[in-house]
């Protein structure tokens, strides 16, 4: 089964995503900020990463995405941005940073699961 990293500064979001995704049999790792997301991604090499954009002090989700895509050890890990940043310019920044998919909050559990399943089926 897949291992997923959820990076969001808000505990309720991480909990909701963890509960939703664990019903699929996936192992869920968590990070509360960009720095922790980079550390966990490099150490654990998850199958897929879910990244918020605004995660408090430190690198934001766009920066984390760019950094991971530039790292030979993590460049092939698919990244889904999960964020309230819904403008077309934000989406363009996310995809330019290397995101595989871009979902805006609020998102539905089935939308999230279907998105992840689709990406994992291609890897």
Model-assigned labels for residue ranges:
Residues 59, 63, 86-103, 114:
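Alpha4 helix (beta4-alpha4-beta5 surface) of REC/receiver domains from two-component response regulators
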Residues 25-32, 40:
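Short hydrophobic/Thr-rich beta-strand motif most characteristic of the beta2 strand and flanking loop
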Residues 107-116:
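C-terminal output helix
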Residues 44-50, 55:
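Active-site beta3 strand of CheY-like receiver
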Residues 39, 62-75:
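Short amphipathic alpha-helix used as the core "switch/output" element in two-component signaling
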Residues 15-23:
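Charged docking surfaces used in two-component/phosphorelay signaling
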Residues 45-47, 73-78:
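His-Asp phosphorelay/catalytic-motif detector in bacterial-type signaling
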């Amino acid at each position: 089964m897949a291992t997923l990293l959820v990076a969001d500064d808000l505990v309720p979001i991480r909990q909701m995503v963890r509960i939703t995704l664990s019903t699929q049999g996936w192992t869920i790792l968590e990070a509360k900020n960009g720095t922790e997301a980079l550390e966990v991604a490099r150490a654990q090499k998850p199958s897929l990463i879910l990244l918020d954009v605004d995660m408090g002090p430190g690198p934001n989700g766009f920066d984390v995405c760019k950094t991971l895509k530039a790292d030979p050890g993590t460049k092939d890990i698919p990244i889904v941005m999960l964020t309230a940043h819904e403008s077309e310019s934000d989406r363009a920044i996310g995809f330019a940073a290397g995101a595989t998919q871009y979902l805006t909050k609020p998102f539905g559990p089935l939308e999230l699961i279907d998105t992840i399943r689709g990406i994992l089926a291609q890897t």
